[in-house]
Amino acid sequence: MAGKRSGWSRAALLQLLLGVNLVVMPPTRARSLRFVTLLYRHGDRSPVKTYPKDPYQEEEWPQGFGQLTKEGMLQHWELGQALRQRYHGFLNTSYHRQEVYVRSTDFDRTLMSAEANLAGLFPPNGMQRFNPNISWQPIPVHTVPITEDRLLKFPLGPCPRYEQLQNETRQTPEYQNESSRNAQFLDMVANETGLTDLTLETVWNVYDTLFCEQTHGLRLPPWASPQTMQRLSRLKDFSFRFLFGIYQQAEKARLQGGVLLAQIRKNLTLMATTSQLPKLLVYSAHDTTLVALQMALDVYNGEQAPYASCHIFELYQEDSGNFSVEMYFRNESDKAPWPLSLPGCPHRCPLQDFLRLTEPVVPKDWQQECQLASGPADTEVIVALAVCGSILFLLIVLLLTVLFRMQAQPPGYRHVADGEDHA
């Protein structure tokens, strides 16, 4: 009986201690999403240019070259709907200007893509409907002139050091081998298109034009066979790698994609410490923007970013109170975004590790790093000019000294001429 009473006492004591712990210890904080940054490419567009022998010139396209099509508008509306579903419970179901900020490059296609995306993300509810027959509301999209854009329009320039790196890239074995392997092919394409200055770096324009025409049901010329299109596509992907990789990728990143990455890092840090930014920050830009950023992050898959593809940064606060970053890439509309892992970090990357690992590709002073370093020849010229300048300076000082002494010397004795008046 005593043993039974002792067992009950121990059980009661255990329950009491558990109750005290529940009262004294704070509840565990659940992991929560705090901030999202999106970078997406515009939707389907018309070609940005054509070639001399192309039977389809600019008048073939309703709005001309480089413009968003109806297909492109739909792609971004659907992306907006997908984002609305993904961030249900994080974003308000209706648009609140304090929650969202959108910036675009100053191109019609990126501005219109952002607007179509926002139409899918924030359809008007209740009082936001200014017309019962229109399920749309205006939401601001911010931009700066193309010539002033140092954040989203790539490649960034003018940057002499970047141009020097590109010249050095052209001398690498990989570039030289690619050039020699495709010399005859490029000659054939140049002859068929009427282009006279076709290179590894410009042939992407031909592929882009043919791809847009094929996508919109226009008949391609006989020379643009499936094999030719496949080869052009591969060279198009090579041109992206030429812009941001192949040679000195880390330094190129500091001069290109690292500039945008620096802003993203700054925003992540700010939201982890002060929460002073909107919950959703959106950049509407181009395939070159995505490739530049992903090359800086070293997560580029080697292929052109498709229309309406979207790179996602999500900042989480863990139950420990620390912050982590997760990245995703949505490049297929019928599939969930692909998880991306920064090299050297798990997919759920602690914020401090994310900042540490990306630090080497972020410029300290972009303007300064874009300047050309003085080479040996430049140093010799500078030294020679300095020596010549010093000699010239000494000669001038010597000459002035002699002249000063001559003027300061008192006049000597002389005979007075006959008939000369005395003072």
Curated annotation (Swiss-Prot):
InterPro entries: Acid_Pase_AS, His_Pase_clade-2, His_PPase_superfam, Histidine_acid_phosphatase. It is found in: Lysosome membrane; Lysosome lumen. GO terms for molecular function: acid phosphatase activity. Its main location: membrane. The active site is at 42 (nucleophile), 287 (proton donor). The chain crosses the membrane at residues 381-401. Its EC number is 3.1.3.2. It catalyses: a phosphate monoester + H2O = an alcohol + phosphate. The membrane-bound form is converted to the soluble form by sequential proteolytic processing. First, the C-terminal cytoplasmic tail is removed. Cleavage by a lysosomal protease releases the soluble form in the lysosome lumen. Disulfide bonds join 159-370, 212-310, 345-349. Keywords: Disulfide bond, Glycoprotein, Hydrolase, Lysosome, Membrane, Signal, Transmembrane, Transmembrane helix. It is linked to Lysosomal acid phosphatase has been shown to be deficient in cultured fibroblasts from patients manifesting intermittent vomiting, hypotonia, lethargy, opisthotonos, terminal bleeding and death in early infancy. This is Lysosomal acid phosphatase. The gene is ACP2.
